[in-house]
UniProtKB/Swiss-Prot annotation:
PANTHER family for this protein: SPECIFICALLY ANDROGEN-REGULATED GENE PROTEIN
InterPro entries with a match to the protein in the record: SARG (IPR026152)
Sequence positions bearing Phosphothreonine: T334
Pfam families: SARG
This protein's encoding gene: Sarg
Descriptive protein name: Specifically androgen-regulated gene protein
Modified residues (Phosphoserine): S130, S132, S397, S412, S524
Organism: Mus musculus (Mouse)
Domain of life (superkingdom): Eukaryota
Ranges of biased composition (kind: Low complexity): 265-277, 381-399
Keyword Cytoplasm among UniProt keywords: yes
Cellular compartments annotated: Cytoplasm
Cellular component, GO annotation: cytosol; plasma membrane
Compositionally skewed regions (Polar residues) per UniProt: 68-81, 141-157, 312-331, 558-568
Similarity annotation: Belongs to the SARG family.
Length: 606
């Protein structure tokens, strides 16, 4: 009798609708409609067992929900269903009834332990118990519901809707894990409650719940389909309404009756949702599940926002220009922006850097009285060299340093570059590149005008006025302009010597200014680390000043003999020696190494 009792009970319930053939489904509906009292009595006895197992399984599910096992088990059960529903549909349709007996006997004592079913299913020739159950589920769903959709929906959905209140407290926790087993208990408890409460209250529930199902079913049909990717268009046209109603009741009972079931379903549903489209489910699921699922992509998006910030930090095309990240970022973004505000910002920054003694040479070219001319022509030189594109904003920006005599001394070597650009266009590419490479002027403030002057003096008397103009620009002092007209070559040494001496003076000034501004001292170590070539370039200027004392004239004369051949190469090599000097400078290499480098460049011969 228990098997027969299980038959009508389970047939009325969904698992047999899943498992049995259409004949089973018809018998289930007929048994429910016809002999409702007797079936309710049998089901009441079974439900007692079911309730015991539900309590046990709920405890186990809570433990598993904490450990996350229940969610893991529910997903594989759903995934194989989608893959194996069709092949087993053909195989297991004739076996529906004998399987239904075995499977329904199992779920009553064993709801959570679906894997315990495989021995019985293997006896029938099935593959895996957990997989065979969902296979049978799809058979019953696709076939029985199509044929007896109206009958099954009316009684089964009524009983399931009415009585899912109690059993789904435990079964909702089981969720997708025991979808096959969820309906039998609701139908069985439905029988208990119907036996006690009689039929009219379920009818009232029918009137209320079909509305809810009509409302909630459309969002949850896709949601459940996402939980178990299966042939839902075929299977769950009527059946989706049942489980939608069940799930809707579960949601309502979750919020109203028992909140702990929410804790059970939440761990189960988020994995299924994460693996599957969550839109419809998020609509139907309780609010507790939505934020947990939606917040994870939001956090991921926040993490995505971080890498662009890192990219902005890492975007250091102007890194060697200003090794400091904030300087580089502002220079890049501000090149496109208005130059005036950028110039003001850079002026303040460069004043601090000048106090540190790091990028003073960079600040100097803008200090020129020819700021506008230098900026315009450096902009012209921008297409020539990308490093030059960084220079134009800089020369225009810091006019503040011009007030300092040390800055004026430093301006002298680089002013030669800017007026040279304006006066002698033949030298523009050669000399515009050094302003682009600000460190070059520091490292080689003297040799650049040397080469130009030697080339001019070497080749023709025409470059002599250029030399005078260059020298006038080189000292950066209008007094030196007069001297340069007379001294020409020696003026190079004098101007460079004065600039080097004045560089020594600003170094003292930088120390005093550093004492004045201790916060710059804090900034200084990082600036030195990032821009080691520049402090070394200052050292190179000092070292080169030692050469200037009595060696520049001889070196210039040697270069004068060399440079006719280097006229064409001056474009290439004038940018190169400062680059090499910058590389040599951070090491603080003595003059001998510098001379060797100059010899390799062909600028010096001893």
């Amino acid at each position: 009798m228990p098997k027969r009792e299980l038959w009508p009970a389970g047939l009325c319930s969904e698992p047999v609708t899943h498992i049995g053939s259409c004949g089973d489904m018809m018998s289930t509906t007929s048994t429910r409609s016809g002999s409702s009292d007797s079936s309710y009595d049998f089901l009441s006895a079974e439900e007692k067992e079911c309730l015991l197992f539900l309590e046990k399984t709920i405890g186990s599910l809570e433990a598993e929900a904490d450990s996350g096992l229940s969610t893991d088990e529910s997903e594989p059960a759903t995934s194989p269903r989608s893959f194996r529903a069709l092949p087993t549909a053909t195989q297991q349709a004739p076996q529906g009834k004998p399987e239904a007996t075995d499977i329904q006997q199992v779920p009553v004592p064993k709801r959570v332990a679906q894997p315990s079913c495989p021995p019985e299913s293997h006896s029938l020739g099935l593959r895996a118990g957990s997989y065979s159950l969902p296979r049978n589920l799809h058979l019953g769903r696709s076939q029985n519901l199509r044929e007896s959709a109206t009958q099954a929906n009316s009684p089964v959905s009524e009983a399931s809707e009415v009585f899912l209140e109690e059993p789904e407290k435990g079964q909702t926790s089981q969720g997708a894990k025991a979808k096959t087993i969820q309906p039998p208990a609701p139908s069985q408890k439905g029988t208990l409650d119907l036996s006690t409460v009689l039929i009219p209250p379920p009818e009232a529930f029918q009137d209320i719940r079909p509305k809810e199902s009509g409302e909630e079913s459309p969002p949850k049909k896709p949601g459940e389909q996402t939980h178990t990717p299966q042939v839902h268009s075929l299977e769950r046209s009527p059946h989706s309404q049942k489980k939608v109603e069940m799930s809707s009741e579960t949601v309502s009972h979750k919020a109203t009756e028992k909140g702990w079931t929410e804790g059970l379903q939440q761990p189960q549903q988020p994995p299924a949702q994460s693996s599957q489209p969550t839109k419809a489910e998020e609509l139907s699921l309780p609010s507790g599940v939505k934020p947990s699922i939606q917040q994870t992509p939001l956090t991921a998006s926040k993490a995505r926002k971080l890498p662009p910030n890192i990219v902005l930090k890492s975007s250091r095309s102007s890194f060697h220009s200003h090794p400091q990240n904030w300087l580089s970022n502002h220079t890049e973004a501000t090149d496109s922006g208005p130059v005036s505000s950028l110039q003001e910002q850079r002026k303040a920054r460069r004043e601090a850097l000048e106090k540190l003694g790091l990028p003073q040479d960079q600040d100097d070219p803008s200090l020129l009285v020819n700021k506008h001319t230098s900026t315009l022509k450096v902009r012209e030189a921008q297409p020539q060299t990308p490093s030059q594109a960084r220079a134009p904003a800089r020369p225009a920006s810091p006019a503040l340093v011009s007030g300092t005599a040390s800055a004026a001394g430093k301006v002298s070597p680089k002013k030669a570059v800017a007026p040279m650009d304006s006066l002698s266009k033949g030298w523009i590419p050669t000399q515009e590149t050094p302003p682009g490479k600000v460190a070059e002027a520091k490292s080689m403030p003297i040799p650049i005008p040397k080469t130009l002057k030697e080339n001019s003096s070497r080749t023709q008397p025409k470059p002599d006025p250029r030399l005078t103009l260059q020298e006038s620009s080189i000292p950066g002092l209008r007094q030196m302009n007069f001297k340069s007209n007379t001294l020409e070559r020696s003026g190079v040494g004098l101007s460079s010597y004065l600039s080097a001496a004045e560089k020594k003076d600003p170094s003292c000034q930088t120390s005093t200014s550093l004492g004045k501004s201790p916060f710059l001292d804090k900034v200084s170590p990082s600036a030195f680390r990032n821009s080691r070539p520049r402090p070394a370039s200052l050292g190179m200027g000092k070292d080169f000043a030692g050469i200037q004392g009595g060696k520049l004239v001889g070196l210039e004369q040697d270069q004068c003999s060399q440079q006719p051949s280097f006229k064409g190469q001056s474009y290439d090599k004038l940018p190169r020696p400062p680059c090499i000097s910058v590389k040599i400078s951070p090491k603080g290499i003595p003059d001998g190494h510098r001379r060797e480098a100059l010899k390799k460049l062909g600028l010096l011969k001893e």
